[in-house]
Amino acid sequence: MYKLVLVRHGESEWNKENLFTGWTDVKLSEKGVSEACEGGRILKEEGYSFDIAFSSMLVRANDTLNIILCELGQSYIDVEKSWRLNERHYGALQGLNKAETAEKYGEDKVLIWRRSYNVPPMPLDESDKRHPIHDSRYKNIPKSELPSTECLKDTVARVIPYWTDKIAKAILEGKRVIVAAHGNSLRALVKYLDNMSEEDILKLNIPTGIPLVYELDKNLKPVKHYYLGDEDKIKAAMESVANQGKKIDR
């Protein structure tokens, strides 16, 4: 039996402001730092330790991981970072307020942009400074692979090869693995692991900073999964994620 721990980064400054973030590199909020500390504390209390960690190229996930590893006294373990674990790219929506966008275009349309499996938002033009081709951290990645926008299907297409080539390989080698990433890159992985339908994945809300444990059999098929922490807090956190795209109350 293997165990895999997944953690969505703690609340970021743009999460706090309810903005579409995507590949924009935004730091953790004060609350996000606290969430990461709490996640690390819970993992320590439950006796978890790790041999290798995987994360994205974005600071909010990297800092969450660093805080957790510090709480565990394991800052020394190997960390592998990849753009394939980045958040879904939200195209021209990046930087816009989710609730105000819902007021302008309607909740149904924003829900489709946020959560549909195969409908991406409007793309960024390559001349836009927000496009990842202008970010030096991606200079070694072919321009053709860097997205202008993504739907969840696109995110799955880049996450799963990384799971197979890197993460699953490490687990099968007997390494204890933690992955600190993002709401949609983790949803892509959960969809694959649990063989979820396109419809069911739309309803999945992964809360920030709360460790999600998967117990896997010898073929890396899930036996069960569960969050660590207080059940009421977990439920409230999941509801908070679900409410992000709703219109502003007047």
Curated annotation (Swiss-Prot):
Q: Name one Pfam family in it.
A: His_Phos_1
- Keyword Membrane listed: no
Question: Which catalysed reactions does the entry list for this protein?
Answer: (2R)-2-phosphoglycerate = (2R)-3-phosphoglycerate
Protein's UniProt keywords contain Isomerase: yes
Protein family (similarity comment): Belongs to the phosphoglycerate mutase family. BPG-dependent PGAM subfamily.
Keyword field: Gluconeogenesis, Glycolysis, Isomerase
Q: Which InterPro entries match?
A: His_Pase_superF_clade-1, His_PPase_superfam, PG/BPGM_mutase_AS, Phosphogly_mut1
Q: Where is the active site?
A: H9, E87
What PANTHER family would the database entry show? PHOSPHOGLYCERATE MUTASE
Among PROSITE patterns, the record links this protein to:
PG_MUTASE (PS00175)
The protein, known as: 2,3-bisphosphoglycerate-dependent phosphoglycerate mutase
Which gene produces this protein? gpmA
* GO-annotated molecular function: phosphoglycerate mutase activity
Transition state stabilizer (site feature) positions: H182
